Structure formats: C-alpha cells, structure tokens
A protein has these predicted regions:
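Bacterial N-terminal signal peptides that target proteins for export
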Residues: 1-11
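Hydrophobic h-region of N-terminal signal peptides that target proteins for export
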Residues: 10-20
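Beta-propeller-forming repeat regions
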Residues: 18-402
C-alpha cells in the first residue's frame, strides 16, 4: 500500500470525525522488544485489574510497568527480520483452580503449551504443560464448543480441521485432537490461513469456518468421532485466506453473516451476507477494502490484515471491527508493500437510505500495526476499550479517549 492513498484516507476520516465526536486513540508503547506476535489480557495476579501477556512475560496492570517472566525465553528479544515462538496467546482457567492460565500457540506447525498460574507471586517459571504437539493454521481459536464451560482449541492438525480439548480429570496431560474433516495434508497444512467459529445455521451450536467453506456441528448427542458435514463456500476466492473469521449479523436481518480478510499477506476485506434458499444456506460477498483506494471504503487500500477482532466496547452498543496491517510479516522486503504505513483501523457500519450496508473505517494508530492476533479489552474500567497489540514493533496499548 503506497503512502499517498493513506494520506487521502486520513482526510476523509477527519471529515467523518468532525461531523460527530468519536473515540480517538493514544498510543502507549510498553516495550519495543519483539517477543511475540500475539497477546492476551486477564487478571493473572488476582488483584481485580487486567494484566497483559506478551511472549514469555506478563505486565501487571494498570500501569504495565512491572514485567514478570512466566516462561523460558530466549534471553533477548527476537530479531524482527525473523520470527518468534509465540504467534497466538490466550488466557483461560484450564485446571479449574480459579486462576487464569496462559496458553501460547507457537510457530505454525509446532507445539502449543499452557502455563499453570501458581497464584502466589514469584520469580520461578510457571509449570509448563503440553497442550497440543502440532498446531496448524495461523489463527486458532479458544472457544467452548459444547456448552460445558471448558475451552476447546479449534485449529488444524495432522492435515485435518478439528479441535483439541484437555481432559478435565487431568488437564496436565496433552489434549487429544479430534478431526471434524477428512485428512487433506496439502489443503490443511501448518501455514493455512483463515479460521473461525460461530453458529451459522441457527441451531444453537457453533460451527467451524475456513477459507473454502464451513463445517456443520452435528447434534450434541452425536458420537465424538462423528465427521461434520461440509458446506463449500469460497470465503477467499482466488486468494490465500485471511485470519480470524468472524460470525455476526451485519445487516440486521437475523441471519449470521461472516466478516473476514481475504488474504493475510495481500489485500481484501469482505462481509459475506447469508441468504436462505430452499437448497440451503448461501452467501453473497460484499467487498469492504481492496488493493485500490477507489475500491475501498474510506479510500483505505490496507494490506496484510493478519488479525481481526469484533468489539462492542469501542462505540457503546455498536459493534466495531478492528484490524490493521501486520508489520513485516515476511520482513522488510516480503509481501506487498512491506514498508507501508502500519495502520490500525476500526470500522463501524450502518445502512444508507437505500438499505445498503456501508462501512466507515477510521484510523486508531499509524505506527503500531498488528501481529497475528491481538486483544481489545477495557483495561482501566472506564467502559471504553483499549487495543493491545504485540508484533515486531514491540507491545503497544492504544487507549481510547473522547
């Protein structure tokens, strides 16, 4: 993405902001060290205040000045020309002791570990347990698939789409991966892009989405090894797949739609409008952002949208999609326009006079960029969300103000 379209886009965004007061964001850099391309938020020390996890460290809220090391680390930051061993980080109580633990999904195709929160403060590394020996796809999700309150790691492994769930009787043992699809190693490999979880058919049970379609969750009474039904749908036609695929009702018709980037290393952001026909569920694509300003909402030709989050705390009572440009995904010479402005954007949408859904993107930041996963959460209890990003530029908090 050349810088010129961004400058034009900034002017358009300024006009929109002048019309009505909206959140603006101020960047605070916690560290410029590169330890992770994902991050998580949770109250790790039990003081009632959210803390931040990034790489082998956690930062105590609300100031995030005090850095604790909970995992073995390389002893120095990773080189931004290369990669870290932390692509996605998640927080959940995995052993039922009431304390949030940390899950680190490593480099694609490698191990996912979870770190047991000891509760009491200390300097010793937390106990590390293997969650899954090989985690494929670059956007795994941690969700409750069956309503029992325990999280599943939805990912790909062994050439198949599926999930891994720890044994509640002994969560320190590695999880068993349960495939929901046949094994297709060439299709579902370590660097596969695009993955989502959501109830697409309205039966109250989450389904799994990927770039070539969606897998329908069978009835809750079905045996564990039941293969899920596949519904083909090109969510990234002619492209390589995006990142986190979001299920939400965009147009207000009561049917779940899909928001997704089309190529995590190039261009494209679309929403897929769900339609019901006698033959079943279909989707109609509506492009939001693309490789040319004239084809993009607000004139933003934004590339490398390698992470997406849907939040209802940016604008009260209204959903907002947060995304941005992954900084140096493949170094300073890889991908398309690797040196383009590392924007972080947030987008809201509404219907115009003709009933068409129109997206309105605004700039949250021009320096931080994103990684492969990030968090949007209220860190200070003021009811407004902060955007927390970790990537090759370090760890940053974008705080909203009015």
């Amino acid at each position: 993405m050349p810088r010129l379209p961004f400058l034009a886009s900034t002017c358009l965004g300024a006009l929109a902001l002048a019309a009505a007061p909206e959140p603006r964001f101020e960047r605070r850099t916690i560290t410029t060290d590169f330890f992770s391309e994902g991050c998580a938020v949770g109250d790790l020390n039990g003081d009632g205040r959210p803390d931040i996890v990034a790489g082998p460290h956690w930062y105590a809220g609300p100031e995030f000045r005090l850095r604790h090391t909970f995992a073995a680390n390389p002893g120095r930051p990773y080189d931004p020309l290369g990669y870290s061993e932390s692509f996605v980080q998640l927080v959940a109580d995995l052993n039922g002791d009431g304390k949030p633990d940390v899950i680190t999904v490593g480099f694609p195709g490698k191990e996912t570990y979870w770190y047991e929160n000891p509760g009491a403060p200390g300097t010793a590394p937390w106990k590390r347990h293997l969650f899954l020996a090989s985690t494929d796809n670059e956007s795994p999700h941690l969700v409750d698939l069956d309503g029992d309150g325990r999280p599943y790691l939805v990912c790909m492994s062994g050439g198949a789409v599926g999930y891994a769930k720890l044994n509640p009787l002994d969560p320190t043992q590695p999880a068993k991966f349960v495939p929901v699809s046949p094994a297709e190693p060439k299709k579902y490999q370590r660097f596969t892009h695009g993955l989502g979880v959501g109830d697409l058919n309205g039966d109250g049970i989450p389904d799994i989405l990927e770039r070539s379609g969606w897998w329908e969750h069978p009835a809750a009474t079905a045996p564990l090894d039941t293969q899920w039904k596949f519904h083909p749908m090109a969510f990234s036609a002619g492209r390589n797949g995006g990142a986190q695929m979001i299920v939400t009702d965009v147009d207000g018709d009561g049917l779940p739609d899909v928001l997704t980037s089309l190529d995590a290393h190039r261009f494209g952001l679309s929403w897929f409008q769900q339609k019901r026909t006698p033959e079943g569920i279909t989707f109609v694509e509506h492009r939001i952002l693309d490789d040319k300003p004239e084809n993009s909402a607000g004139g933003f030709a934004l590339g490398q949208m390698h992470a997406l989050v849907l939040s209802r705390q940016i604008v009260a009572g209204q959903p907002a999609l947060v995304t941005g440009k992954r900084f140096w995904a493949h170094g300073p010479k890889g991908d398309v326009n690797p040196q383009a402005t590392p924007l972080v954007l947030w987008l809201t949408w509404a219907k115009d006079a003709e009933g068409k859904v129109v997206f309105n993107p605004r700039v949250a930041d021009t320096e931080a960029g994103i990684g492969t996963q990030f968090e949007v959460a209220d860190l200070d209890g003021d009811g407004r969300a902060e955007i927390v990003v970790a990537n090759k530029k370090g760890l940053h908090v974008l705080s909203s103000a009015r």
